[in-house]
């Protein structure tokens, strides 16, 4: 065996490989794409925000092309799939999907980037997504210390929706059950 070769301690084909030194190699997934202003195909703008500096939970916000009608838009808090261990809110496929979804649904979207397994085991993803929902709801009272203008200026906090695919659907269920048991800030 090559002295420089690392030994595999666990594999989850075709998704990932974990080495004895703790390195995680993700075998599938699409690459990172930056946020865009005025996507050429949809007119949707996006930007990245840090929700929690302590846990590094972040999100990509999406805003549809604005019309002269300044009516506030529904909010979609979206959780990605990927078996809790692959993909990202910043991946090409998910970015493309959210651009189309936001354009068609005419919503402000918050696409949560939660920490992935196996580095961060459940319930970390649930807690990260709950923190993101609390962050969104904290904007319902206006411009606080950590406010995001796309939410305070364009979002209707009487119309918040949760969505997700695959593992994200599981997170939607968990977060909705938690919202029933615990109150969100400002009674949302």
List each language-model region with its residue ranges.
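Short amphipathic alpha-helix adjacent to the substrate-entry channel of hydrolases
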Residues: 90-110, 130-131
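Short beta-to-alpha linker loops that shape the active-site pocket of alpha/beta-hydrolase fold enzymes
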Residues: 82, 113-117
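Short beta-strand element of the alpha/beta-hydrolase
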Residues: 71-83
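Short acidic, Pro/Gly- and aromatic-enriched capping/linker segments at domain boundaries
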Residues: 2-17
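Primarily recognizes the serine-hydrolase "nucleophile elbow" in alpha/beta-hydrolase
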Residues: 131-188
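Active-site loop/oxyanion-hole signature of alpha/beta-hydrolase fold enzymes
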Residues: 123-131
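N-terminal cap/lid segment of alpha/beta-hydrolase-fold proteins
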Residues: 18-71
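Conserved catalytic-core motifs of eukaryotic protein kinase domains, centered on the activation segment
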Residues: 87-91, 120-122
């Amino acid at each position: 065996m090559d002295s420089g070769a690392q030994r595999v301690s666990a594999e989850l084909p075709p998704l990932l490989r974990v080495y004895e030194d703790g390195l995680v190699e993700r075998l599938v997934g699409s690459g990172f794409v930056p946020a865009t202003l005025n996507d050429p195909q949809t007119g949707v703008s996006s930007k990245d925000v840090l929700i929690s500096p302590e846990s590094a939970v972040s999100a990509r916000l999406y805003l549809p092309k604005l019309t002269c009608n300044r009516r506030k838009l529904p909010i979609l808090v979206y959780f990605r799939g990927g078996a809790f261990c692959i993909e990202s809110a910043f991946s090409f496929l998910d970015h493309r999907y959210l651009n189309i979804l936001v354009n068609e649904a005419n919503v402000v979207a918050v696409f949560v980037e939660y920490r992935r397994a196996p580095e961060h085991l459940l319930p970390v993803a649930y807690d990260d997504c709950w923190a993101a929902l609390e962050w969104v709801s904290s904007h319902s009272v206006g411009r606080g210390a950590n406010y995001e203008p796309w939410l305070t200026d364009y979002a209707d906090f009487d119309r918040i929706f949760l969505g997700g695919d695959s593992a994200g659907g599981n997170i939607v269920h968990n977060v909705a059950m938690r919202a029933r048991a615990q109150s969100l800030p400002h009674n949302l």
